[in-house]
From Swiss-Prot:
<comment type="similarity">
    <text>Belongs to the TrpC family.</text>
</comment>
<dbReference type="InterPro" id="IPR045186">
    <property type="entry name" value="Indole-3-glycerol_P_synth"/>
</dbReference>
<dbReference type="InterPro" id="IPR013798">
    <property type="entry name" value="Indole-3-glycerol_P_synth_dom"/>
</dbReference>
<keyword id="KW-0028">Amino-acid biosynthesis</keyword>
<dbReference type="Pfam" id="PF00218">
    <property type="entry name" value="IGPS"/>
</dbReference>
<dbReference type="InterPro" id="IPR001468">
    <property type="entry name" value="Indole-3-GlycerolPSynthase_CS"/>
</dbReference>
<keyword id="KW-0822">Tryptophan biosynthesis</keyword>
<keyword id="KW-0456">Lyase</keyword>
<keyword id="KW-0210">Decarboxylase</keyword>
<dbReference type="InterPro" id="IPR011060">
    <property type="entry name" value="RibuloseP-bd_barrel"/>
</dbReference>
<dbReference type="InterPro" id="IPR013785">
    <property type="entry name" value="Aldolase_TIM"/>
</dbReference>
<dbReference type="GO" id="GO:0004425">
    <property type="term" value="F:indole-3-glycerol-phosphate synthase activity"/>
</dbReference>
<keyword id="KW-0057">Aromatic amino acid biosynthesis</keyword>
<dbReference type="GO" id="GO:0004640">
    <property type="term" value="F:phosphoribosylanthranilate isomerase activity"/>
</dbReference>
<protein>
    <recommendedName>
        <fullName>Indole-3-glycerol phosphate synthase</fullName>
        <ecNumber>4.1.1.48</ecNumber>
    </recommendedName>
</protein>
<dbReference type="GO" id="GO:0000162">
    <property type="term" value="P:L-tryptophan biosynthetic process"/>
</dbReference>
<comment type="pathway">
    <text>Amino-acid biosynthesis; L-tryptophan biosynthesis; L-tryptophan from chorismate: step 4/5.</text>
</comment>
């Protein structure tokens, strides 16, 4: 397990534990369960991703700790509409406030303006956050292996499936992949190409880890996909699912940036 102490990720996780305590005081788990039951029906995230080639999870992100403000003119509803028209399979919506200037309500805003399923992109540390994701109308959650113990991964993925949520498990290296593979095969696997300590990006990380997976297992490459050549390189290694945010968010028209990178995805 990567030691995340003294990294940005470590600071984020510490803040998330503080945030969890505050949220529990504001609304107990039982109340959140009731909100989750009343949420709009799930849209199948994994299913949508598997039926587009390439399958693109297009991210709605205003800022990041490393880049600061990425998109000053930030309208989640408009961005969601543009992504759907461009051919995205799914959305990824940042809800972290402190480091990414996201907001819980952005999931519902984005979903209300398109038919795409949405991932709650956040740093979840407890099953409470998972139930909360469903209450916020998310269709999928992100579990970052570097932030969580094996027990937490098991418990939180189980909670997600009990609430009809899909699960994207994110890894950075071989050791984390080995841990992720202990979880249900229902989980989607994502490889983040960004080194947590240096923040350098190496697309070969996905290619290297892909070789350790059964051919049938869908793999999503995350971070650093910026040019059509990057996309082609992944496709040549039988990687057809992508999570892309910054490359779209920093352009005036995210839909045009999407088309420049991926062309027109086909339904399969």
């Amino acid at each position: 397990m990567i030691n995340i102490q003294n990294t940005i990720l470590g600071k984020i996780v510490d803040r998330k534990h503080e945030d969890l305590a505050a949220r529990l005081k504001q609304r107990n788990l039982q109340d959140v369960e009731e909100l989750a039951k009343a949420a709009t029906p799930v849209r199948g995230f994994a299913n949508a991703l598997q039926h587009k080639r390439p399958g693109v999870i297009a991210e709605i992100k205003k800022a990041s700790p490393s880049k600061g403000i990425i998109r000053a003119d930030f309208n989640p509803a408009e961005i969601a509409q543009q992504y759907e028209q461009a051919g995205a399979a799914c959305l990824s919506v940042l809800t972290d406030v402190d480091f990414f200037q996201g907001a819980d309500e952005n999931i519902a805003i984005a979903r209300n303006h398109c038919t795409l399923p949405a991932l709650r992109k956040d740093f979840l540390v407890d099953p409470y956050n998972v139930v909360e994701a469903r209450a916020l109308h998310a269709d999928c959650i992100l579990l970052i292996v570097a932030c969580l113990s094996d027990q937490q991964l098991e418990e939180m993925s189980k909670t997600a499936f009990e609430h009809q949520l899909d699960v994207l498990v994110e890894v950075h290296d071989e050791e984390e992949l080995e841990r992720a593979l202990k979880l249900s095969e229902q989980c989607l696997l994502g490889v983040n190409n960004r080194n947590l300590k240096t923040f350098d990006v190496d697309l070969n990380t996905t290619i290297r880890l892909k070789k350790l997976l059964p051919a049938s297992r869908l793999l999503i490459t995350e971070s650093g996909i910026a040019t059509p050549d990057d996309v082609r390189m992944m496709q040549e290694h039988d990687i057809h699912s992508f999570l892309v945010g910054e490359s779209f968010m920093k352009q005036p028209r995210p839909d045009q940036a999407f088309t420049a990178l991926f062309g027109q995805p086909q339904t399969v």
